[in-house]
Amino acid sequence: MARYPYSPALKPPGNWTSIDFADPRLAPAIRLMIQGIQTDLSSFTPPDGLTLNRKQVTVWDGETISCYILEPEGGCPKLPTMLYCHGGGFFLPIQTMMMHLAAQYALELGIRVYLPEYRIVPEHPNPYPFRDCLSIMEIIQKQDVHYLLYGESAGGTLAAGLALWARDHNTKPANGQCLIYPVLDNRCSRYASMRLYSEAAWPLKNNLTMWREYLKNGKMGLDDYLVPMTAPNLAGLPQAYIEPQQIDTLRDEAIAYAKRLEQADIPVTLQVIEGSYHGFDADTTNPFVQEIVHRRIEKMREMLKGNSE
């Protein structure tokens, strides 16, 4: 991996992001990696004050997926809610660091967090990841609670697409969308950051592979929801918190999406994190990471409060 001026406050990024997930020769190793992630996740214990349930949920095509639900102990049925769309390039399942972040959000905001284990590529390209998350959003909407859409990396694509879907289908809108180093556009050559940081923590070759595998069924009439940057009109969407990392291939598309939202008169908080990289928040106890996480929490608190007054 090329050397970049990452903040000394952060651990260097790991090497797993340089794996070519589309290389069939690596398939056995990738399966072992996924099994290891799942084993680690199975040992996760929520902090005091929270409960964790894993439910099997029937989704759009009649199949079932797992959905983790974190919530305060003794919480009322109609708690404010977050739909957390996890990252992983559409190739990887929920990782333990994501559960730690979800638990922190649930505890500090006093909310219920849904973490769906949506189906992943290569076995399940579009529309499975988006439709699976849409099924969970519809469950939340029926509860008639304030809710947030949250997604990191590939999950940012899903969260942004769900916000567009809710607008276009006139269903209950989210109070806000929180997009953390999000994937938003498959037209990678449009962005200078793709060239500047092509070998950074989320390398260009993996980004290209991700889009190729995710969209290999075509867009199936879901164009704007699968690739949110292609939506011609962003008016009427929820307010947004967008957090690109300075040293990331995805930086410029996140900034461009924030500017488009602003042009559509959508309130946007854009936080470019200096010296940071894709997936930096995996080190959840790091003081630098915690400072950024608390910024997110305060913004999400504002989002929930703003629509409840």
Residue positions per predicted region:
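A glycine/proline-hinged amphipathic helix-loop "lid/cap" segment
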Residues: 1-72, 304, 308-309
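Short beta-strand-to-loop junctions in surface cap/lid or active-site-entrance loops
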Residues: 67-78, 229-234
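Short beta-strand element of the alpha/beta-hydrolase
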Residues: 78-87
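Catalytic nucleophile-loop/oxyanion-hole region of alpha/beta-hydrolase
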Residues: 95, 101-102, 114-148, 287-290
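Gly/Ala-rich beta-loop-alpha elbow adjacent to hydrolase catalytic centers
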Residues: 151, 155, 159
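Hydrolase active-site cap/lid region
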Residues: 164-219
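Short beta-strand/loop motif that positions the catalytic acidic residue
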Residues: 242-244
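Catalytic active-site module of serine/aspartate enzymes centered on a nucleophile-bearing elbow/loop
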Residues: 285-309
